[in-house]
């Protein structure tokens, strides 16, 4: 069998030499007649869109998991760095972590195996309690060992790639950090009552300021009682416009035009303030008589 395989004959089952193999490789004929067809079929094959989508989803999921793993390792590293920055003692006469005095007058101390610093028993961790001679580690060295164990650095002989979390802006995105909801404060009833009183007072002031002089004069004229010395005067007759005049009877005294300017009405209101009837009415003030047949009476508008 071996002679048949390694013989120099031209049998088709004999392995060709290197020259023939190189020639067949250039001609893409392969080892047998079926080799070229298999290669051709392999080249013509292509993936369907569904298969391509599934492959892309697997790749994207692997990338997301990789990013999550890097963020997890970054949180471990940040915690370790924070502990290293918050040391308060020198590790010789004081505890490395809390800064408590050590010695005869202070707390009892233990010696960390990794960093060779002294810490108190509260800040130290006993790594091997079953041994005759206990092994102590400080919290920083114990956390560093935990980081190497949980990140896989012991396998890679170094810390893998990690992503540190953001400082202050990133705390809001942390699922473990949520700001307390602030309840809206209800308005006090006292403040609402004060605002209502203020609105009422303001409306009264505005409404009093919006009255015109003509309204005041017309109301005062209608409420004024009839003079005792005049008879037959038409006081019940409705007034017209502010510029109109009232006619006097033939047998009674004549009256001047009833329209007055704004200054005269204001002057009359100031002078008539003192001659007010206790019952609420205003008394007329007659003008001095002039020599003649007719007597005129001045009407004061308020």
Swiss-Prot record:
Coarse class of the protein's main subcellular location: cytoplasm
Residue sites binding Zn(2+) 1 per the record: 95, 98, 120, 123
One Pfam family it belongs to: FYVE_2
Positions where Phosphoserine occurs in the chain: 248
Zinc finger (FYVE-type) residue numbers: 89-146
Gene3D superfamilies: Zinc/RING finger domain, C3HC4 (zinc finger)
GO BP annotation list: calcium-dependent activation of synaptic vesicle fusion; G protein-coupled receptor signaling pathway; glucose homeostasis; intracellular protein transport; negative regulation of G protein-coupled receptor signaling pathway; positive regulation of calcium ion-dependent exocytosis; positive regulation of insulin secretion; positive regulation of protein secretion
CDD domains: FYVE_RPH3L
Tissues in which the UniProt entry reports expression: Highly expressed in pancreatic islets and parotid. High to moderate expression in adrenal gland, pituitary gland and ovary.
Compartment(s) where it occurs, according to its Swiss-Prot or TrEMBL record: Cytoplasm; Cytoplasmic vesicle, Secretory vesicle membrane
Binding of Zn(2+) 2, residues: 112, 115, 138, 141
Keyword entries, A-Z: Cytoplasm, Cytoplasmic vesicle, Exocytosis, Membrane, Metal-binding, Phosphoprotein, Zinc, Zinc-finger
Source organism, top-level taxon: Eukaryota
Transmembrane segments annotated in the record for this chain: none
GO cellular component: presynapse; secretory granule; synapse; transport vesicle membrane
One MF annotation (Gene Ontology) recorded for this entry: small GTPase binding
Domain (RabBD): residue spans on this chain: 41-158
PANTHER family, alphabetized: RAB EFFECTOR NOC2 (PTHR45729:SF4), RABPHILIN, ISOFORM A (PTHR45729)
Record note on domains: The N-terminus of the RabBD domain is necessary and sufficient for interaction with RAB27A.
Subunit structure: Recruited to dense-core vesicles through specific interaction with RAB27A in endocrine cells. Interacts with RAB3A, RAB3B, RAB3C and RAB3D. Interacts with ZYX.
Role description: Rab GTPase effector involved in the late steps of regulated exocytosis, both in endocrine and exocrine cells. Regulates the exocytosis of dense-core vesicles in neuroendocrine cells through interaction with RAB27A. Acts as a potential RAB3B effector protein in epithelial cells.
Identification of the protein by name: Rab effector Noc2
Organism, scientific name: Rattus norvegicus (Rat)
Gene: Rph3al
């Amino acid at each position: 069998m071996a002679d048949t395989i390694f013989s120099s004959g031209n049998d088709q089952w004999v392995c060709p030499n290197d020259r023939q193999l190189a020639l067949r490789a250039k001609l893409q004929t392969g080892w047998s007649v079926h080799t070229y067809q298999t290669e051709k079929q392999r080249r013509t094959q292509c993936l369907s869109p569904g298969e391509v989508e599934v492959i892309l989803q697997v790749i994207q999921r692997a990338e997301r998991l990789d990013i999550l793993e890097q963020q997890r390792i970054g949180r471990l590293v940040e915690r370790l760095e924070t502990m290293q920055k918050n040391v308060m003692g020198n590790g010789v006469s004081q505890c490395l972590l809390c800064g408590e005095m050590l010695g005869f007058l202070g707390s009892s101390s233990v010696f960390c195996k990794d960093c060779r610093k002294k810490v108190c028993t509260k800040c130290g961790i006993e790594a091997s309690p079953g041994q005759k001679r206990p092994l102590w580690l400080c919290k920083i060295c114990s956390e560093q060992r935990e980081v190497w164990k949980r990140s896989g650095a012991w396998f890679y002989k170094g810390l893998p790639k990690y992503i540190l979390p953001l400082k202050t802006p990133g705390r809001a995105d942390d699922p473990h950090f949520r700001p307390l909801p602030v309840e809206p404060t209800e308005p006090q009833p006292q403040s609402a009552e004060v605002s209502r009183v203020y609105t009422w007072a303001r409306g009264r002031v505005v409404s009093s300021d919006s009255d015109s002089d003509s309204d005041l004069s017309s109301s005062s004229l209608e409420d004024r009682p009839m003079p005792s010395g005049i008879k037959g005067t038409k006081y019940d007759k409705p007034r017209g416009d502010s510029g109109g005049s009232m006619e006097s009877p033939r047998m009674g005294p004549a009256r001047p035009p009833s329209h007055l300017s704004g200054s005269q009405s204001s002057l009359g209101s100031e002078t008539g303030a003192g001659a007010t009837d206790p019952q609420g009415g205003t008394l007329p003030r007659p003008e001095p008589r002039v020599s003649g047949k007719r007597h005129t009476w001045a009407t004061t508008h308020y």
